[in-house]
Every structure is written in structure tokens, then in C-alpha cells.
Amino acid sequence: MAGHSKWANIQHRKGRQDEKRGAAFSKIAKEITVASKMGGGDINFNPRLRVAVDKAKGVNMPKDKIDTAIKKGTGELEGVEYIEIRYEGYGIGGAAIMVDCLTDNKVRTVAEVRHAFSKFGGNMGSDGCVAFQFKHCGQMIFAPGTDEGALMDAAIEAGADDVTTNDDGSIEVLTPPNDYMAVKDALEAAGFKPEFGEVTMKPEGENVFAGEEGVKMQKLLDALENLDDVQEIYTTAVIED
């Protein structure tokens, strides 16, 4: 058994995604465009695109928006040229934060990210300053009550790296990043549908915040998340109710 309430954290995150559905569509469309530009528009031959499209379907993004984003990447439609950038830094209490961005203006983006860090008690660091605190992997979370033994057998057979039952009864399955969709497909075919899944940078440790400190930390994360150029935020911070 391991971890804080992963299930509660996932439900909270899904709720926030629902509240910001329009922004989520925009961010995922960017990722689809970049993925299709880099690897082509066929999800069968482009793992990154397949993950992005799977994510789009997970938030009920309309098919026409997905198709438009792909065509912008392949050049069938005119689109914006995006640059991928990752910024690293610290929140209050030294919590590690990584910020992945897609931007058409690097100068604007770095200024906005730095401002968000400094305004809410954090600070930007140099490249690599916190990356060692995260593991690049595929992650799936299954609901409490899932048959742990059967899921573990199916996950191992499908090529998962690790299966962990959390304190709250939810089950976490980790995969190599490039094998995420193959493992997910195999588990769904075996009758196990994750409540949440993504290719992510999973924190190796936790900085737990509560009360006023938790509120401060959430404000920093919200400020970063609300920036148009920010795609994903990864952090060691765990904010308890």
C-alpha cells in the first residue's frame, strides 16, 4: 500500500478539467498539431499522436476539432508554428515544479512563467534543477474495488513496469512511456478501464501542504496552469483538504 489519496486527487483533477473544458480543448489541440507535424497524421504509426487523440477523446473533444488539429500539423490546413519548451523551478517549501509549454513566442512565455513563479512565492530554476525528481512513464489509475490480483496479472502480461495499490484502494499501473497505449489497450480488452491515464512525469517524492500553505501552493499552480502557453504542470506538491 502506498501514497496519499490518489483517488481523491484524480477526482479533483478531473473536476477541474471539466470546469475548464474550453481551455483543455485548446491545449490538447496544440499537442495534436505538434505531434502530427513531428510524426505524421496516422495514429497507427505515430505513438505520440495516438496518446494525444486518446486524451482528446477522454475529455469529449469533438472529432472535427481533432481532425482540424491533425491537418494543421500535417500542413493540409494553415497553422501556427509551435516550439516545445520545459521550464523548471520551485514552489513554496522547495516543492519541485516542471512546466511544459507549446508557444509561438518564447520571449513572452518565459516572462509569463517567471512572473507566475515570483508572484506566488516560487522561483524559476535552471534546466535540470528538478528533473531528477521525476520519472517519465505512462500512468493509469483504476477505481477502488478493482480486482487487484486479476489486474496485476493482466498488467504484467501486457508489459507494465509496476502495479501498486494505494492507501485509498485505488490501483496505479505504470508503463514505459512508449508502451502506454499498448498496455492500456490490452487492459481494456481484458475488462479493466482506467478512470484516468496519461504519459506523464511522475514525482519520485512528495511535499505535502495543508491549510494556508496549501492555499498558497494552489494559487501558484493555478497561475501557471492558466497561462495560454502552458500544456502540463508536474509537481511534487500534494495539497490536502
UniProtKB/Swiss-Prot annotation:
It comes from the Bacteria. GO terms for cellular component: cytosol. The keyword Signal does not apply. Its main location: cytoplasm. Residues 1-22 are annotated as: Disordered. Keywords: Cytoplasm, DNA-binding, Transcription, Transcription regulation. Signal peptide: none annotated. PANTHER family: TRANSCRIPTIONAL REGULATORY PROTEIN YEBC-RELATED (PTHR12532:SF6), TRANSLATIONAL ACTIVATOR OF CYTOCHROME C OXIDASE 1 (PTHR12532). HAMAP family: Transcrip_reg_TACO1. One of its GO terms (molecular function) is DNA binding. InterPro entries: Integrase-like_N, TACO1_YebC-like_2nd/3rd_dom, TACO1_YebC_N, Transcrip_reg_TACO1-like, Transcrip_reg_TACO1-like_dom3, YebC-like. Belongs to the TACO1 family. The keyword RNA-binding does not apply. It comes from Dechloromonas aromatica (strain RCB). It holds the Pfam family TACO1_YebC_N. This is Probable transcriptional regulatory protein Daro_4067. GO terms for biological process: regulation of DNA-templated transcription. It is found in: Cytoplasm.
